[in-house]
């Protein structure tokens, strides 16, 4: 086939026109050593702290140590296929994770990839994993209640929206149970829940997911899982991934609740990373910035001012203690960062007081101003009564000849402790909690044996549901007990007293 001269010039013109001078420039480096989820890379001179790096096989990494001659990076994924001499690319982006409504109801890993087999997550919104917490001007004091559905907490250690309340205790004392009950109690409300599982067994996470599905709570819950079998970098980053997802709702005028279960394991993972990166160890071999690790995470939970959308992000971090030692390094750090703590005790747990909350050591520093007024009215004397009961019970062990007043106080205390017990996965609405505590405080349960109080409580709720639902509705709407409502409650309790037989 012959080509004429004018055609040649035409072809050349076309080629020149279509010629693209774009050359892809990527700054690359070479892995000089790798092991235990940490890679040292030579040649990435312009890398940023926290930058996303691209390893062979589509695996991501995060630049943590920027040294003179190399970069120390944590590999966010399986690193068995990566070897010395491999090429690593810069992405010029800080580590980001997907955020938005599309994540609700899903189970994702520490970098926001779905692991529940329900297909990809359809969202075009991404959030940076490391951002600064809102400043003072953007915040507002906590003033709305975050109901947990647990009588002992809502009455004596109330939590508000935007608060950080630590749940602390030994292993097997019901810490996760308190958190899961709080999630279940948000059903039908306007709170999006995020549960971050750090360093837990996969079977435990699967159990949590199935329990939440059973109670219809996955409809408003996101689960971020970095299980025990995953590398330390993923366990370290997962709480930041969770809080980034929560911030999306907070900044869009919505309310979110995030649970970190638990931050002790995140600190251990961070200690491992830091030691492998050759950062100098401090107390208990943790690095010097382990306080900052948790403070920058928990400061991102807050109540936002009306000008910024009036959203909120409430955090319930969990810390596991060893043999009740609250004065260890990580527990004291997190206690000082948070706005109060719920202390769970193994002695109480094994003696049948569940939730096993030690009322003397548990405190809520800001929740009082967020507590529902009706609850404040009935629970005002509760903490004092329980403290007096505990003191008397300690003395009563030594002597048997107690006067009548002391015996009555001990009997009342026993009944109060019994009333505050609650089975798992059965959160109670606020207005019903107010009723049972009102009955306990005003002596309506004093004449019944302690063993029959569980039945008294359930029958009382059934009685009010069936015959006094208008009073429950009034209490729910007014959120306070005025003289009129008080008279109605008293007459209803008197009516119930005639019907109930212990």
Curated annotation (Swiss-Prot):
Classification via PANTHER family: ATP SYNTHASE SUBUNIT ALPHA, MITOCHONDRIAL
Catalytic activity: ATP + H2O + 4 H(+)(in) = ADP + phosphate + 5 H(+)(out)
Keywords: ATP synthesis, ATP-binding, Cell inner membrane, Cell membrane, CF(1), Hydrogen ion transport, Ion transport, Membrane, Nucleotide-binding, Translocase, Transport
Record NCBIfam families: atpA, PRK13343.1
Binding-site list for ATP: 169-176
GO molecular function: ADP binding; ATP binding; proton-transporting ATP synthase activity, rotational mechanism
Origin superkingdom: Bacteria
CDD domains named in the record: ATP-synt_F1_alpha_C, ATP-synt_F1_alpha_N, F1-ATPase_alpha_CD
Enzyme class: translocase
Name the record gives this protein: ATP synthase subunit alpha
Membrane topology: Peripheral membrane protein
Pfam families, A to Z: ATP-synt_ab, ATP-synt_ab_C, ATP-synt_ab_N
Protein purpose: Produces ATP from ADP in the presence of a proton gradient across the membrane. The alpha chain is a regulatory subunit.
Location within or outside the cell: Cell inner membrane
Family statement drawn from the similarity comment of this UniProt entry: Belongs to the ATPase alpha/beta chains family.
E.C. number(s) listed in UniProt: 7.1.2.2
Binding partners and assembly: F-type ATPases have 2 components, CF(1) - the catalytic core - and CF(0) - the membrane proton channel. CF(1) has five subunits: alpha(3), beta(3), gamma(1), delta(1), epsilon(1). CF(0) has three main subunits: a(1), b(2) and c(9-12). The alpha and beta chains form an alternating ring which encloses part of the gamma chain. CF(1) is attached to CF(0) by a central stalk formed by the gamma and epsilon chains, while a peripheral stalk is formed by the delta and b chains.
Cellular component GO terms, alphabetical: plasma membrane; proton-transporting ATP synthase complex
Transmembrane segments: none
Listed InterPro entries: ATP_synth_asu-like_sf, ATP_synth_asu_C, ATP_synth_asu_C_sf, ATP_synth_F1_a_nt-bd_dom, ATP_synth_F1_asu, ATPase_a/bsu_AS, ATPase_F1/V1/A1_a/bsu_N, ATPase_F1/V1/A1_a/bsu_N_sf
